[in-house]
């Protein structure tokens, strides 16, 4: 990241100056009260949040849900396939919603039919199955399916259905469609008797926001513009899912044959409901094989006799539609009209925000003149006719190298800015804009990169980008908070400090947590630095911690430290320095409850999954979803202590009475349930109502404590390194990836020095050594001599125990959480990112090899660590443990 004095390229573009310089009139807001009032009244849950993923889904207003719930509470809606009074009400209401949808798109039941589906993807699949394809024969070439390469995966996936019908698929590049010569209607020839073809293209690219001409619909259908040189009649499917969320669509003018949509893109609620708008002139040609409930006029169970219903909608809506969700659409339309005045107002408002952000973002420069971002677009954001409220980009460093989108996403999360990263289910546009060849896509797959993961750079080349998008409730403050975030993390002021971000309570600032701010962390067993490395006046910050536990002596873990007891710092001081090249264990930590506070020990037994009872429990919400400090930072204030003699875990927290949980389940009483950790299914059991009530009281919401079942074996998902054989696959507790995490004090010391240089002279040190160690939540701490030397290790030996190094840990934003208070500070992540050249790696994962548990095995503070280096070892990045 660049430093140095402020310069014009680091300034935030004033909105007033932008409006004055615009060549066209721009509209911001809706002219009926302030947008801030609308946000406060309808979207109060967005306080402190910058939501910029409206292309993924927009957000619903509070009044929409309130109105819908009132409707449900006042009316009885029965199954529309029945004939009773409540069912008749449902049927009539659903039909009114169909009319409302058609009116929204400026058409009528005479021209179009609304077929409800589960979403636009299901609508596309329906078209692929029902279109009247003609297979090639001896007398003709048959139908063809053409699609713009800048299309969603769900469009491209239609080719698998057409291929089964022996129908050819032809991808068409946007530039080829743009340059296709227009013909007059006479030159196009008579399509009578020729096979039908289908051309699919998006009204708006979900990757870049490019808006393709709606005039293509009429030109292709009339034969004046051909996607491919095939004789026959052309039909057009307009993928409007991304477009209609922020723009009006007039089907009386642009009469596409098929228009798939998803309603959550427009209203935010309901999800799981979409529609296919079918031009009635084509409806009679559609074919259907399967028939479900409600679609038959008559059929025989014992003979192949079936007559479909006459209504196109009833013929294709198999089974009972999601009628309550359909009824919810009425309240969505009402809210949208009431709050904004209509889609044209939304189009103007969202485009103004996008054009401003694009202008400001593209003007940012490093002191050497290099751009801060690379924007992927086919337009100059000159008009909403050619560009939607979407900006796809990658952040660059001052040498022009791409900063991985995963890192940008993590940094944005620290500021509570919600963006989308990757290729957005649009590989064609991703390849085109990023210059990724077909061969590179296959190579990336072989390297382990799949759609939707966080592998953002391969050989320095980006595999995707960052996307921001605006919705009707987006504000100027959202746009400016995002721009300030880019400026603050990429450009610096004259003092070397980041430019100011939003203040608490303002858009873009993390929400204030008064409970966390006022919480005083109780004494807990944690690590401390060795004397030669931490000589600051704050080195005794944890001197009130209880003594670290010796598993052999089984010191009672709940005893507070006294003058006669040896403190953690004193025990660390007993570790011999030895040769400069030697490494010893200075601290051992286990984390009995995933994402909760550490429990420090002096000597501890090993189990088949790592340190005994390390991450054997986890806290889940009322839906059984595992919680981490990313969602609930105050988890770090929950302090577990393991008492091996009494076979219990004692849990403490500030303001709460200690509570005990048995280490093992009662097999006769326990009820096994299933949960997930990093997409892995795990068998667990609930630890009971008593601890659940305790947790719920502390956090103020219903939580449960669950433990991994002792007879359930969970294997690591993949092998790491070249030489690891299948029989060495590790068994895991509730960790994400590996059994152990090791960090090196020299690496911590370098990070500490970097953070110290950011402080003004004489300012109190913000990051003592112990504070930093606790943030990385490692099991094994060593006193290495060189920063990050552990990443070069292949194996280590600790006494008779051997451990394989699986690779570096790729860190997430959890390292920004102070483990004593639960408060966030993004400096740690940012500085580590600078030091590690865009990849936030810290610590290495270990797996024990050939562990014989027939006799007890222990790790101890003071044990010598002997690393083994191997040249040309490959290690893949592994996500952080929690």
UniProtKB/Swiss-Prot annotation:
GO function terms (MF aspect): lyase activity; molybdenum cofactor sulfurtransferase activity; molybdenum ion binding; pyridoxal phosphate binding
Modification Phosphoserine, positions: 528, 530
Modified residues (N6-(pyridoxal phosphate)lysine): 265
Recorded coiled-coil stretches: none
SUPFAM superfamilies linked: MOSC N-terminal domain-like (SSF141673), PK beta-barrel domain-like (SSF50800), PLP-dependent transferases (SSF53383)
Needed cofactors: pyridoxal 5'-phosphate
Record has Phosphoprotein as a keyword: yes
Catalytic residue list: 425
Keyword Nucleus part of the UniProt annotation: no
Domain MOSC: from-to ranges: 707-868
Pathway in which this enzyme or protein is active: Cofactor biosynthesis; molybdopterin biosynthesis
Family: Belongs to the class-V pyridoxal-phosphate-dependent aminotransferase family. MOCOS subfamily.
Pathological association: Defects in MOCOS are the cause of xanthinuria type II (XU-II). XU-II is characterized by excretion of very large amounts of xanthine in the urine and a tendency to form xanthine stones. Uric acid is strikingly diminished in serum and urine. In addition, cows suffering of XU-II cannot metabolize allopurinol into oxypurinol due to the lack of ADO activity.
Identification of the protein by name: Molybdenum cofactor sulfurase
């Amino acid at each position: 990241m660049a430093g140095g004095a402020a310069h014009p390229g680091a300034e935030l573009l004033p909105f007033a100056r932008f409006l004055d310089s615009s060549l066209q009139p721009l509209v911001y807001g809706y002219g009926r009260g302030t947008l801030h009032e609308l946000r406060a009244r309808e979207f109060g849950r967005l306080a402190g949040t910058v939501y910029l993923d409206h292309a993924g889904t927009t957000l619903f207003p509070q009044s929409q849900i309130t109105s819908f719930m009132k409707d449900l509470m006042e009316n009885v809606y029965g199954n529309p396939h029945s004939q009773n009074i409540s069912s008749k009400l449902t049927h009539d209401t659903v039909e009114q919603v169909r009319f409302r949808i058609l009116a929204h798109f400026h058409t009528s039941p005479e021209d179009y039919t609304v077929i409800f589906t589960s979403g636009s993807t299901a609508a596309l699949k329906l078209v692929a199955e029902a279109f009247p394809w003609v297979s090639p024969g001896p007398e003709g070439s048959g139908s063809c399916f053409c699609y713009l390469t800048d299309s969603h995966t769900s469009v491209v996936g239609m080719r698998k259905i057409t291929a089964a019908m022996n129908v050819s698929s032809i991808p068409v590049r946007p530039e080829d469609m743009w340059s296709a010569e227009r013909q007059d209607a006479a030159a196009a020839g008579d399509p009578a008797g020729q096979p039908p073809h289908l051309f699919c293209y998006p009204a708006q690219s979900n990757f870049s926001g490019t808006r393709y001409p709606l005039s293509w619909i009429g030109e292709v259908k009339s034969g004046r513009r051909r996607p491919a040189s095939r004789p026959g009649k052309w039909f057009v499917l307009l993928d409007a899912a991304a477009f209609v969320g922020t723009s009006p669509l007039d089907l009386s003018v642009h009469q596409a044959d098929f228009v798939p949509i998803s309603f959550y893109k427009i209203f935010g609620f309901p999800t799981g409901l979409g529609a296919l708008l079918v031009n009635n002139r084509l409806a009679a040609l559609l074919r259907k094989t399967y028939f479900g409930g409600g679609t038959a006029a008559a059929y025989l169970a014992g003979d192949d006799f079936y007559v479909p219903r006459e209504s196109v909608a009833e013929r294709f809506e198999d089974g009972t539609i999601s009628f309550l969700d359909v009824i919810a659409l009425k309240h969505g339309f009402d809210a949208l009209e009431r709050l904004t005045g209509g889609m044209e107002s939304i189009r103007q408002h969202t485009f103004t925000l996008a054009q401003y952000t694009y202008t400001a973002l593209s003007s940012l420069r490093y002191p050497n003149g290099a751009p801060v971002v690379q924007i992927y677009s086919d337009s100059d954001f000159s008009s909403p006719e050619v560009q939607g409220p979407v900006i796809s980009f990658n952040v660059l460093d001052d040498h022009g190298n791409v900063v991985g989108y995963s890192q940008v996403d993590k940094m944005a999360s620290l500021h509570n800015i919600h963006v989308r990263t990757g290729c957005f289910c649009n590989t064609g546009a991703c390849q085109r804009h990023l210059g990724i060849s077909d061969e590179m896509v296959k190579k990336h797959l072989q390297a382990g990169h799949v759609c939707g993961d966080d592998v953002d750079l391969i050989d320095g080349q980006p595999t995707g980008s960052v996307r921001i998008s605006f919705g009707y409730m987006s504000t100027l403050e959202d746009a400016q908070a995002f721009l300030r975030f880019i400026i603050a993390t990429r450009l610096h002021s004259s003092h070397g400090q980041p430019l100011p971000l939003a203040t608490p309570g303002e858009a873009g600032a993390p929400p204030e947590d008064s409970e966390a701010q006022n919480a005083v962390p109780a004494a807990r067993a944690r690590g401390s630095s060795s004397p030669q490395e931490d000589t600051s006046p704050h080195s005794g910050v944890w001197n009130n911690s209880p003594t670290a536990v010796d598993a052999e002596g089984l010191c009672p873990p709940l005893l507070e430290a006294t003058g006669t007891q040896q403190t953690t710092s004193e025990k660390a001081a007993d570790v011999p320095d030895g040769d400069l090249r030697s490494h010893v264990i200075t601290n051992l930590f286990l984390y009995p409850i995933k994402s909760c506070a550490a429990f420090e020990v002096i000597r501890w037994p090993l189990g088949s999954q790592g340190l005994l009872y390390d991450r054997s429990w986890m806290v889940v919400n009322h839906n059984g979803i595992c919680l981490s400090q990313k969602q609930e930072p105050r988890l770090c204030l929950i302090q577990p202590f393991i008492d091996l003699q009494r076979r219990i875990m004692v849990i403490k927290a500030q303001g709460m009475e200690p509570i005990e949980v048995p280490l093992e389940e009662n097999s006769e009483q326990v009820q096994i349930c299933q949960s997930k950790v990093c997409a892995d299914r795990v068998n667990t059991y609930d630890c009971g109502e008593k601890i659940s009530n305790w947790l719920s009281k502390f956090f103020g919401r219903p939580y449960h404590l669950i433990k991994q079942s002792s007879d359930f074996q969970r294997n690591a998902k993949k092998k790491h390194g070249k030489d690891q054989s299948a029989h060495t696959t590790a068994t895991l507790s509730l960790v994400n990836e590996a059994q152990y995490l090791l960090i090196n004090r020299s690496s911590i010391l370098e990070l500490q020095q970097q953070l110290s240089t950011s402080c003004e002279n004489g300012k109190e040190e913000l990051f003592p050594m112990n504070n930093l160690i606790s943030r990385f939540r490692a099991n094994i701490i060593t006193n290495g001599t060189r920063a990050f030397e552990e990443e070069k290790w292949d194996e280590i030996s600790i006494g008779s125990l051997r451990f394989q190094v699986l690779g570096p840990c790729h860190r997430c934003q959890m390292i920004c959480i102070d483990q004593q208070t639960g408060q966030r500070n993004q400096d740690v992540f940012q500085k580590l990112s600078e030091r590690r050249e865009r990849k936030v790696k810290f610590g290495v994962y270990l797996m024990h090899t050939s562990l014989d548990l027939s006799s007890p095995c222990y790790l101890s503070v003071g044990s010598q660590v002997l690393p083994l280096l191997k040249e040309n070892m490959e290690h893949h990045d592994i996500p952080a443990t929690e």
